[in-house]
Amino acid sequence: MAEEPKPISPLKNLLAGGFGGVCLVFVGHPLDTVKVRLQTQPPSLPGQPPMYSGTIDCFRKTLFREGITGLYRGMAAPIIGVTPMFAVCFFGFGLGKRLQQKSPEDELTYPQLFTAGMLSGVFTTGIMTPGERIKCLLQIQASSGKNKYSGTLDCAKKLYQEFGIRGFYKGTALTLMRDVPASGMYFMTYEWLKNLFTPQGKSVHDLSVPRVLVAGGFRGIFNWVVAIPPDVLKSRFQTAPPGKYPNGFRDVLRELIREEGVTSLYKGFNAVMIRAFPANAACFLGFEIPMKILNWIAPNL
């Protein structure tokens, strides 16, 4: 007898998504630090080598100069923001799916899943942008040799003192440009892979842990293929001195292409791809397990 479809619960998505986000940050932050440092390093002078020659070089130099804590620099900001951010992300996805269903039995098409995923990206931008701004500033300050901020709270306090609440939301448009299409790809790919990995006659809810890990990991890779160019622009814009880019992302884009070519839009690609699989596998395992527990404890919630 087929299992009766359950109505999508945005509340369960909220709770399980928060835990999944914590798992993602803890596993993925070291290579996120490497990614941001590669994306924001200045062009090298003629005849001089760049500060970092690549992902492994940046990882090695950070570990040697700052220890393991250097790789986790700025993690407090995303940890503080990640529970509500991923909770809202999965809530937005659940809501997006529910809005397109006439009944719980309706199966959504992949374009509909993409649309629901894009809604989740809109939902998360308000939480994501301040955390990304603080995280990026803390991640690059050690490599630049200027320790302006002693930590997350100090950075938040000084940003507010200097720029007011708007200082936290520098880069909002670029965060939207990154997260809306990337979130659509993020969730659509995951649902497609789950369906692909589900044996005939079985439910996607019965997927084994290894298959959940593989589906979550590859979803992260597809997500970042879409997200890297706007992420490079966002990192550069959010860490730039005030007034450097008066026309926003257009100035950043022109400068990058003029000075470093189109390939500069994929700075940090190796770090992102190495990070994407384990971090997102951990995220979706961290989401699926609490969701199963919640469905067992409160099936009608």
UniProtKB/Swiss-Prot annotation:
Chief place where the protein resides: mitochondrion
N-acetylalanine PTM positions: A2
Keyword Transmembrane recorded: yes
Domain of life (superkingdom): Eukaryota
Modification(s) after translation: The N-terminus is blocked.
Catalytic activity reported: O-acetyl-(R)-carnitine(in) + (R)-carnitine(out) = O-acetyl-(R)-carnitine(out) + (R)-carnitine(in); an O-acyl-(R)-carnitine(in) + (R)-carnitine(out) = an O-acyl-(R)-carnitine(out) + (R)-carnitine(in); O-propanoyl-(R)-carnitine(in) + (R)-carnitine(out) = O-propanoyl-(R)-carnitine(out) + (R)-carnitine(in); O-hexadecanoyl-(R)-carnitine(in) + (R)-carnitine(out) = O-hexadecanoyl-(R)-carnitine(out) + (R)-carnitine(in)
Gene3D superfamilies linked: Mitochondrial carrier domain
Regions crossing the membrane: 13-31, 74-93, 113-131, 171-190, 212-230, 268-287
Solcar repeat intervals: 8-99, 108-196, 207-293
GO aspect biological process, one term: carnitine transmembrane transport
Residue ranges that the UniProt entry lists as topological domain Cytoplasmic: 2-12, 94-112, 191-211, 288-301
Residue numbers carrying N6-acetyllysine: K148, K157, K170
Positions on the Mitochondrial matrix side per record topology: 32-73, 132-170, 231-267
GO CC list: mitochondrial envelope; mitochondrial inner membrane
Gene Ontology molecular functions: carnitine:O-acyl-L-carnitine antiporter activity; O-acyl-L-carnitine transmembrane transporter activity
Positions bearing N6-succinyllysine: K170
Family in the record: Belongs to the mitochondrial carrier (TC 2.A.29) family.
Known role: Mediates the electroneutral exchange of acylcarnitines (O-acyl-(R)-carnitine or L-acylcarnitine) of different acyl chain lengths (ranging from O-acetyl-(R)-carnitine to long-chain O-acyl-(R)-carnitines) with free carnitine ((R)-carnitine or L-carnitine) across the mitochondrial inner membrane, via a ping-pong mechanism. Key player in the mitochondrial oxidation pathway, it translocates the fatty acids in the form of acylcarnitines into the mitochondrial matrix, where the carnitine palmitoyltransferase 2 (CPT-2) activates them to undergo fatty acid beta-oxidation.
Name of this protein: Mitochondrial carnitine/acylcarnitine carrier protein
Gene: Slc25a20
